[in-house]
């Protein structure tokens, strides 16, 4: 591999990540780029704590944008618009070699459009595809005017972009692939997974709005489940910024869960859990890679639910189902997200039932479906970012 550090003595990369998941992606990408380009590479932009540990000084705290739901967004709209304009101005002022936008398309794509209008020669790479394959498919074609390359986390996304007339799209792999070793149990942990009483993971979401929508329903579900499995152990992984809200809320549950904080404790819980009750989202893919059968649920505000029903065009909202291309994970959405339906489904996957066996068989093939060869997702992503800079300089 050529020594980019000596061939390219100075590079400035502007990254924008406004959610925790994007912050983690950005941090891994920064590490991979620094390995390739050396210490001369400089980073500017927007990010969270993990990107800060890699040296990024964020334009503003990303917690400002951790809002979800139509009504909440409307209330914060003036602040959001101000941040979009300010971030675009900062990109132009920085004059970077490349702009990398990471997830959060409602924010990052608006910034990218503003930047492209004012600086047409700046390459723009989108790390994490918007869900154009699920809803608002016209976005794919529209992205051609302001995104030069999409880095996909899901293996079916490049084909979707070709079909929809979008920009070039390359599957680089999901960051969860780098965690398989710490997600899957060793022999002793597998024995604990199969032992009684069973351990159930409860994952109500990572945003405050999600917690509010799911926590009480999940608590009632555990109460119903405890009637048939009295000694069930319940573990609820969460993050430091949510623990103060979650801890008092679960104190009144019929079966009080053990709340664990941080990635290490979360992964340890994954390795011994027999099953999980999870809010629909990336965590379903994480559970599938860990080999944990699950029931998925999602409840949104009435306005968001009304909109979603009219625009979503996929057979399942569960990421793991979409990657596997088979609806093996039961999903209970909106009015179906009730204890009377969740508890029986959980009881079924906690036992050696056909549903549990079907999920485990499907999960066994997930590695092959998502494989990226010998290189990590962040390394593959760094390749494309570097190539975008190289092509841009060649045109100058």
Curated annotation (Swiss-Prot):
Key word Transferase present: yes
Alphabetical list of Pfam families matching this protein: LpxB
Keyword annotations: Glycosyltransferase, Lipid A biosynthesis, Lipid biosynthesis, Lipid metabolism, Transferase
SUPFAM superfamilies: UDP-Glycosyltransferase/glycogen phosphorylase (SSF53756)
GO BP annotations, alphabetical order: lipid A biosynthetic process
Pathway: Bacterial outer membrane biogenesis; LPS lipid A biosynthesis
Reactions catalysed according to its record: a lipid X + a UDP-2-N,3-O-bis[(3R)-3-hydroxyacyl]-alpha-D-glucosamine = a lipid A disaccharide + UDP + H(+)
Disulfide bonds: none
InterPro entries in alphabetical order: Glyco_trans_19 (IPR003835)
EC number annotated for this UniProt entry: 2.4.1.182
GO terms, molecular function: lipid-A-disaccharide synthase activity; phospholipid binding
Function: Condensation of UDP-2,3-diacylglucosamine and 2,3-diacylglucosamine-1-phosphate to form lipid A disaccharide, a precursor of lipid A, a phosphorylated glycolipid that anchors the lipopolysaccharide to the outer membrane of the cell.
Matches recorded under PANTHER family: LIPID-A-DISACCHARIDE SYNTHASE, LIPID-A-DISACCHARIDE SYNTHASE, MITOCHONDRIAL-RELATED
Family: Belongs to the LpxB family.
HAMAP family (alphabetical): LpxB
Protein name: Lipid-A-disaccharide synthase
Protein source organism: Nitrobacter winogradskyi (strain ATCC 25391 / DSM 10237 / CIP 104748 / NCIMB 11846 / Nb-255)
């Amino acid at each position: 591999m050529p020594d980019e550090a000596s061939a390219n003595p100075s590079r400035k990369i502007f990254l924008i990540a406004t959610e925790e998941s994007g912050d983690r992606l950005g941090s891994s990408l920064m590490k991979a780029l620094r390995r390739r380009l050396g210490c001369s590479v400089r980073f500017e932009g927007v990010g969270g704590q993990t990107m800060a540990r890699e040296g990024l000084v964020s334009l503003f705290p990303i917690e400002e944008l951790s809002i979800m739901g139509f009504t909440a967004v409307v209330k914060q709209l003036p602040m959001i618009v101000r941040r979009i304009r300010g971030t675009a101005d900062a990109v132009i002022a920085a004059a970077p070699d490349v702009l990398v936008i990471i997830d959060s398309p409602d924010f990052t794509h608006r910034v990218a459009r503003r930047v492209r209008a004012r600086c047409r020669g700046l390459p723009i790479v989108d790390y994490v595809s918007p869900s154009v394959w699920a809803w608002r498919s016209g976005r794919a074609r529209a992205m051609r005017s302001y995104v030069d390359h999409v880095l996909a986390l899901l293996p079916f996304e490049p084909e979707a972009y070709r079909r929809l007339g979008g920009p070039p799209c390359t599957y680089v792999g999901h960051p969860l692939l780098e965690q398989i070793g710490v997600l899957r149990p060793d022999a002793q942990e597998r024995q604990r997974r199969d032992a009684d009483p069973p351990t159930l993971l409860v994952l109500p979401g990572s945003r405050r709005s999600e917690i509010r929508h799911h926590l009480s329903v999940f608590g009632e579900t555990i109460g119903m489940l405890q009637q048939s499995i009295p000694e069930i152990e319940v573990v609820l992984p969460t993050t430091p910024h949510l623990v103060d809200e979650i801890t008092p809320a679960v104190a009144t549950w019929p079966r009080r869960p053990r709340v664990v904080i941080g990635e290490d404790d979360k992964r340890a819980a994954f390795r011994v859990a027999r099953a999980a009750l999870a809010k629909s989202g990336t965590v379903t893919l994480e559970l599938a890679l860990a080999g944990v059968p699950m029931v998925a649920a999602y409840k949104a505000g009435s306005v968001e639910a009304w909109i979603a029903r009219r625009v979503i065009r996929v057979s399942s909202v569960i990421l793991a189902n979409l990657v596997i291309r088979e609806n093996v994970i039961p999903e209970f959405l909106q009015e179906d997200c009730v204890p009377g339906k969740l508890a029986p489904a959980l009881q079924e996957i906690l036992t050696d039932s056909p549903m549990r066996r079907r999920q485990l068989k499907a999960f066994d093939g997930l590695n092959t479906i998502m494989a990226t060869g010998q290189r990590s997702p962040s390394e593959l992503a760094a390749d494309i970012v570097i190539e975008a800079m190289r092509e841009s300089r060649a045109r100058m």
